[in-house]
């Protein structure tokens, strides 16, 4: 892979977010249900920009010791993403599975506490928490499946035909693609760092696709 293409992918977690944010800024109004997604986009932009700046410039500009690793930011990003999309799914006007959705959110909180108490170190400079990101992807996938299950059982559900559909579909694709990336990332990092770097490109491609689906959702609100 050429240096130019590598540079594009290295910064993809930043510029990909600018696409849906641009669509958001163009719109005069957005559906209230999309507010958690908009909040996520802005927070993700700050977090991802911080991640890339640390990765690209920590050596050149001699960042202090506590800024020599961006892995803790990935842990923060995982928690932020789950919190925003958990709120998004719980807020959907779908009466079924309400308590189950709340239970999923509680499971994530309990898992995170146990994980960082007994298994992982939150501020680990060597790697982000594969356990955390894997659990996040799995639970978000359950949210997506519950959404589709409700939509299949209710043909009149307007949420299955608008911007919410595009967001859930994009999120579902993102977590399905990256579940195994997160699951085996820490092991691969220890055994073959070069392969791990190449596999992370798959994550970046999935993230670009995810952002394009969000853009499609926001564009739909602009047209309407």
Residue ranges of each PLM-predicted region?
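Terminal, non-globular segments
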Residues: 1-224
